[in-house]
Every structure is written in C-alpha cells, then in structure tokens.
Amino acid sequence: VRGAVCPYVSRGGLKLEKALRDFGVKPEGFVCSDSGASTGGFTDCMLQNGARQVYAVDVGHGQLAWKLRNDERVVCMEKTNFRYMLREHIQDDLDFASVDVSFISLKLILPVARELLSDSGEAVCLIKPQFEAGKENVGKNGVVRDKNVHISVVEMIVDFCLNNGFDVLGLDYSPIKGPQGNIEYLIHIKKSN
C-alpha cells in the first residue's frame, strides 16, 4: 500500500502549503525568500503557487534539490546565514518571506527579514519551541513536551513581532511535527508602517 505522493521536493512544502491556504496568502508574482531552504520544500511550494523569484537561503550547501537549482526563478544562496543578509544581496524588495530555521531564534532572523521586505511585505515563520525556550526547558532528545513552555514561547514570539515592526495576522499549528516529534507553529506576519 502506498501513501499519497508529496507534491514538493520535501515534506516541508506541506507546512507552507497549509499556511498559504489557511492564512490566505497568494504569492503569485511575488519576489520571495526561503530562509532555511534546505532541500527546498518551501521554495517549491512558492514556485508552484506562482512566485516570480525565490531566494533560497541556507547555511548549508549541496542540499537544494536539483530541479530547483536549475530553475531560473531560484537564486540559490548556499553557505549564507540569513541573519547577516543585507539589502545589497538581493535585487528587489521581498514581497514575501518564509522562515524555517533551526538552532537559532526567530528573534535574530525577523529584524533582518523586516529590512528586506517591501512596505507591504508579509512572512510566514515556523516557531520551533526547542530553539526558543532555553536549554532548561528542553527535554531529552531536544523535545519540548510542557504545554506551558509552548504557550510562553508562542507568546514571546508574538510579542517580539508586535514590538519590532510587524502585525500578527495569524497563528496555527504546523501540519507536520519537527524531528523527534516536536510540535511547531506557523505565524503569519506583515510589516507594519
């Protein structure tokens, strides 16, 4: 018996697919970024939803799927930490940014995203409690099981967004758990003026 075939180069695309659908984001014609691109599931999802261009940014190298590397709409930015991205690294303001990073807090990524977004730019980010909660709140194998820690992490990121130039438009569960079964959250934000 076979399950459904994933329509993206990785299951990560299913996370962004849910966010685009549930938050009503339509990236058709958009210039986008995919921070933490890895294999490119988010990049693939954006392209399949009409993105004009995607900057696929990742600190690693050799991970982005071959079909995306060869797509003229994709700018592969390997060995690049989004945290240190500057305006001159991209040709146009971003209409949309996705963030799916590990081992770093969103609090270090979001100020950079805000600088690169257009005045009406939006973003969908994965909130990963295991990278936001602090070591004392992360259990065995890097799993956060305490519901109260999840709540405090989500509240912290929402507050950070609101206090750092973003409006929060939506919040939901990710349809796929992270490694080791971590529950992750999707947040939809928009640059406030």
Language-model features: locations:
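Short alpha-helix
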Residues: 150-164
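Conserved class I S-adenosyl-L-methionine
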Residues: 28-38
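Conserved SAM-binding loop of SAM-dependent methyltransferases across substrates and taxa
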Residues: 39-50
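Core SAM-dependent methyltransferase catalytic element
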Residues: 176-193
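S4-like RNA-binding module at protein N-termini
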Residues: 1-25
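A short glycine-rich, Lys/Arg-flanked "PGG" loop and its adjoining helix->strand segment in the class I
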Residues: 107-124
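S-adenosyl-L-methionine
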Residues: 53-108
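Short, glycine-/aromatic-enriched active-site segment of Class I SAM-dependent methyltransferases
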Residues: 129-146
